[in-house]
Structure formats: C-alpha cells, structure tokens
C-alpha cells in the first residue's frame, strides 16, 4: 500500500516513516512538510533516521496524493480538513490522528467520507481503544447515583489542545455507557467556589509538563472505594503502528467514516 505521511517533519511524522519501513504491505510513497520548513527537499528516510528512501519531502500535498493509496495525518485541524478534501477527490484512504477538531471540522470529515475511506480517532493505540470499551462497560455497570466519573490526563509541555483527544474519547465512552450526552454533562474547568459536584457529570482534569507522551486514567469514585482504569504510553510508535494498521485495514473498505474500534473489531454490533 502506497502511503503518504503529512507533517513528516514532526515527531509523529518521523515515527510513521519508521513504522511504514518495517511494515509488510506498506511503502512510503510521498512525504509532505509545511511550506517553508527546513525539511523540504530532504530525504524523508534521512529525516526519520532510517537512511535514504528516495522520497524527498515536498510541500505540494496535491502532487503527493497522486497515485497514492492512502495518507496518514497527525497535523492540525485546519490542515486535516484540507487533506480530507484532497483524499475525497483522490478516492483514497485518510487516517486522521489529529486532535482538537471543532464540530465544523467534524462535519467536513463526514462530507469527505462520502468518497474517501476515513479512519479518525483521538488515539490510534490498541490499548487505549480497549480501555475505552472497558470504561463504557464500567460506566454502565456502576450507576451514576453512586459513582462519579473523572478523567485525568497528562501530556508533554508542548501539547496545544486540552483536554486531550484521548481524554475526550474516554469521556465519550463513559457517556455512552451511561446513556448520556457528553457535551451536556462534561465539566472541563473548575475554579473558585464551584459548589458541590453536579450529579451525573463527567469531570476532566488536565496536566501538562516535561516530555510525557500520554498518561490517562478514568476514575469511578463511589462511597468508600475507587475503581481506576488507566493507560500509559511509553513510546510514540504505538500510535504510528495503530495508524498504519488502520490504513491497511481501510484499503478494501467502502467509503465512510470509521474509528479505531472498527479497525480492531471492538465496535458494538449495529
């Protein structure tokens, strides 16, 4: 499968190049960097530390998508929206690991999915997606009247969005288990005299510092006991492996908007 990596200059982009090189059935077709980036013109393999691959980094996404089978995208919401439109035009696979997307962005992805095979997730790792299933089960089993749900996450100091896409994914899983709408029940800020905790709400706490790749915990707090479900990411390659796995999975699927739960066979039967 001929894959394009966009945002190749970043840490995730370079991790993707390395994983593609070691994955049977995948090959790096093109690599896209930001216009004006110092990486433009450099060999993507050299950039990722795997040696020359004969794939120079370009800032022309349209040309890069020609004759490709799929694109893997951990960039920014505004660029992911642009890439989804290009993927739809090219009728190819688009794997989106970008977080911090707005409802308007999500609507654009849904529109693009009429022609592209899009897999979008706040986290591409197997462990986190399994965790989300367990969170939904726990939230369903432990009733809101006696159990409060809090989502705690920590990331490196350079992360620009909060709560993380993974924290929101886990919050959505908890809300699904409870049969509620997360947008109505989420509490993302607590400051000053907040009063008692709102019954049935799902709280979020965000920590930033150092080089932490990703730590997530979902706490279900009852009277006299706490159940904690957690995941720790020790290496960015777990996200890259999941993204490449998703691309290979989506290659023979119909156009549509899929999640990593679909890729991993963890989605609920429809």
Swiss-Prot record:
Keywords: Amino-acid biosynthesis, Cytoplasm, Diaminopimelate biosynthesis, Lysine biosynthesis, NAD, NADP, Oxidoreductase. Catalyzes the conversion of 4-hydroxy-tetrahydrodipicolinate (HTPA) to tetrahydrodipicolinate. Belongs to the DapB family. NAD(+) binds at residues 7-12, 97-99, 121-124. One of its GO terms (biological process) is lysine biosynthetic process via diaminopimelate. InterPro entries: DapB_C, DapB_N, DapB_N_CS, DHDPR_bac, NAD(P)-bd_dom_sf. Transmembrane segments: none annotated. It comes from Allorhizobium ampelinum (strain ATCC BAA-846 / DSM 112012 / S4) (Agrobacterium vitis (strain S4)). PANTHER family: 4-HYDROXY-TETRAHYDRODIPICOLINATE REDUCTASE 1, CHLOROPLASTIC-RELATED, DIHYDRODIPICOLINATE REDUCTASE. The gene is dapB. GO terms for molecular function: 4-hydroxy-tetrahydrodipicolinate reductase; NAD binding; NADP binding; oxidoreductase activity, acting on CH or CH2 groups, NAD or NADP as acceptor. It catalyses: (S)-2,3,4,5-tetrahydrodipicolinate + NAD(+) + H2O = (2S,4S)-4-hydroxy-2,3,4,5-tetrahydrodipicolinate + NADH + H(+); (S)-2,3,4,5-tetrahydrodipicolinate + NADP(+) + H2O = (2S,4S)-4-hydroxy-2,3,4,5-tetrahydrodipicolinate + NADPH + H(+). Pathway: Amino-acid biosynthesis; L-lysine biosynthesis via DAP pathway; (S)-tetrahydrodipicolinate from L-aspartate: step 4/4. This is 4-hydroxy-tetrahydrodipicolinate reductase. Its main location: cytoplasm. Signal peptide: none annotated. (S)-2,3,4,5-tetrahydrodipicolinate binds at residues 156, 165-166.
């Amino acid at each position: 499968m001929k894959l394009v990596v966009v945002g190749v200059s970043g840490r995730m982009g370079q991790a993707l190049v390395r994983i593609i090189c070691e994955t049977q059935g995948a090959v790096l077709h093109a690599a896209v960097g930001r216009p004006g980036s110092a990486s433009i013109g450099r060999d993507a393999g050299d950039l990722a530390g795997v040696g020359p691959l004969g794939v120079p980094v370009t800032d022309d996404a349209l040309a890069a998508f020609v004759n490709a089978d799929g694109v893997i995208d951990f960039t920014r919401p505004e660029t992911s929206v642009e890439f989804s439109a290009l993927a739809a035009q090219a009728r190819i696979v688009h794997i989106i690991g970008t977080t911090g997307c707005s409802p308007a962005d999500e609507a654009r992805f849904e529109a693009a999915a009429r022609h592209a095979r899009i897999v979008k997730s706040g986290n591409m790792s197997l462990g986190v997606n399994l965790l989300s299933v367990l969170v939904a089960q726990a939230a369903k089993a432990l009733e809101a009247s006696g159990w409060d749900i809090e989502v705690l996450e920590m990331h490196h100091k350079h992360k620009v969005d909060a709560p993380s896409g993974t924290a929101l994914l886990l919050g959505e899983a908890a809300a699904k288990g409870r049969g509620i709408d997360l947008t109505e029940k989420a509490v993302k800020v607590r400051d000053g005299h907040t009063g008692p905790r709102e019954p049935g709400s799902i709280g979020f706490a965000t920590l930033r510092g150092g080089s932490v790749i990703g730590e997530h915990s979902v706490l279900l707090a009852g009277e006299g006991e706490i159940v904690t479900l957690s995941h720790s990411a020790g290496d960015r390659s777990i996200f890259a492996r999941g993204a490449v796995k998703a691309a290979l999975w989506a290659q023979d699927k119909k156009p549509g908007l899929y999640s990593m739960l679909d890729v991993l066979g963890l989605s609920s039967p429809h």
